Amino acid sequence: MEPIKNIPRLCRTLGYEFAEQALLDQALTHRSASNKHNERLEFLGDSILSIVISDALYHQFPKATEGDLSRMRATLVCGKMLAEIAIEFKLGDYLKLGPGELKSGGFRRESILADAVEAIIGAIYLDSDIEKCRKLVLNWYASRLRVIEPINQKDPKTLLQEHLQKFRKPLPIYKVVHTEGDAHEQTFTVECVVEDLRQAVVGVASSRRKAEQSAAAQVLELIKK
């Protein structure tokens, strides 16, 4: 099996340099490609992600109920959210998949991408320690943690629209500026334009809707600073 290419670029994207690169290789290896795959690392990363996000929400929302905290955590650690992070990292470019998964477009499949993010978290923990892992996860989630609210768990597009309406501002304009890949495996690049920002904000995802949500989340972060 060929080595994974462009590892230095991926490490720069992640914000972490592995001392033991074999851990990263394993985290990127799907069970269809090798017996030494990423499922055990995924198990570990899932637990670490849960405690890091739980701790962040507990301190960020001191008056939130247990139910509110649970719903916010579920939103942040769900497969859809993890897959969005994977797409932002272009993680599909680095995955090791078996021939069948490659042929069926597994490098774009939400579940495979989400599992790989959790596996990378597990690999970083084993390569360093829990505090280093915590800082990285919080950095990856910074924009999402800034815009999440205890009530209703509205999506970023809805939250952005309500925020702009509150201040009597024009609604955002979303525009697809680029698509890439075959019809069933496309990546969408969407621009979001709002009055208060000098330039458009770009979101990239596996669907137009997800790309719009990603762009809206970034806009919310910028205008609430």
Swiss-Prot record:
Recorded superkingdom: Bacteria
Active site annotation, chain numbering: D46, E118
SUPFAM superfamilies associated with the record: dsRNA-binding domain-like, RNase III domain-like
One Pfam entry name: dsrm
Segments forming a coiled coil: none
Localization of this protein: Cytoplasm
SMART domains for this protein: DSRM, RIBOc
Function of the protein: Digests double-stranded RNA. Involved in the processing of primary rRNA transcript to yield the immediate precursors to the large and small rRNAs (23S and 16S). Processes some mRNAs, and tRNAs when they are encoded in the rRNA operon. Processes pre-crRNA and tracrRNA of type II CRISPR loci if present in the organism.
Subunit structure: Homodimer.
Protein name from the UniProt record: Ribonuclease 3
